[in-house]
Amino acid sequence: MKHHNYYPSTCLSILPFLLPLTMSHPQQNLLATTTSNTKAGNPVFPGWYADPEARLFNAQYWIYPTYSADYSEQTFFDAFSSPDLLTWTKHPTILNITNIPWSTNRAAWAPSVGRRLRSSANAEEEYDYFLYFSVGDGTGIGVAKSTTGKPEGPYEDVLGEPLVNGTVYGAEAIDAQIFQDDDGRNWLYFGGWSHAVVVELGEDMISLKGDYLEITPEGYVEGPWMLKRNGIYYYMFSVGGWGDNSYGVSYVTADSPTGPFSSTPKKILQGNDAVGTSTGHNSVFTPDGQDYYIVYHRRYVNDTARDHRVTCIDRMYFNEAGEILPVNITLEGVEGRTLS
């Protein structure tokens, strides 16, 4: 959660990125900070962006982040797509919250995107895409729908009011994540103020089904992410203070998406003074069900400006017991990889 901003001239003066297209183009092709012929480098694209959610849609990698800026400047969401983890295309302003009357026109945080098949065909036009977002520093969590049937939108608010309104079990209505289980059920995880909540989504993906459940694990602060692997549910979340190097990621496990969860969290992501600090608010993707990648934000070493957060990708590994191993954060990033 929290702020982000992107100043093209400033970022280009301090980061070794190339922008082949002009800034006025509706989509901007970006190169990651490539450190070799095969590795992307971290951060993966320019600009102050945090809370990155990774998705795999239509043989492309997608990242939906928060724009890291003052609350008053956070009035939109950008998205980024890549065929290979090396070259990224920026899709500006996929949702403008100033067009949403209930939004308060500030503090647009932590988007999460899911999709629903319209028919049995697998063409991209056969999907409806839904974007869950929080605005107004806890005003509520809304849901928007792609008007084009594509993951880049643009998206428009579909309810005219929040899907989740106000505080639930002490949880601020921020940092939504849609988790689409392999049994066809959809779950919405969310929560700030050190409380975590989950609720099932209706089949239409724009309504709630059933009751809210509080699932707060020890140390939870914000930024939930649910991952399922080999029948085990890994509930990942941010711990510590997002403004300093106590920020990190821990996880607990369960046999169901609503718990009960293991009682002792394990911390697997932590910044350091050699690579980057304030590492947190993660997501995870796997291209093949075997190799796993963690996407997260961090700050440059010795940069304490609260909104100077950048998006990074590193590998994530499991041991034979199914435990997530501590992540080695890097400057070189991950190797390029296409999706079949």
Curated annotation (Swiss-Prot):
Q: What class of enzyme is it?
A: hydrolase
List its EC numbers.
3.2.1.-
Pathway given for this chain reads: Glycan degradation
UniProt cross-references to CDD domains, sorted A to Z: GH43_XlnD-like
Reported pH dependence:
Optimum pH is 5.0.
**Which domain of life does this protein belong to?**
Eukaryota
Designated name of the protein? Beta-D-galactofuranosidase xynD
Q: Which organism is it from?
A: Aspergillus niger (strain ATCC MYA-4892 / CBS 513.88 / FGSC A1513)
Q: Which gene encodes it?
A: xynD
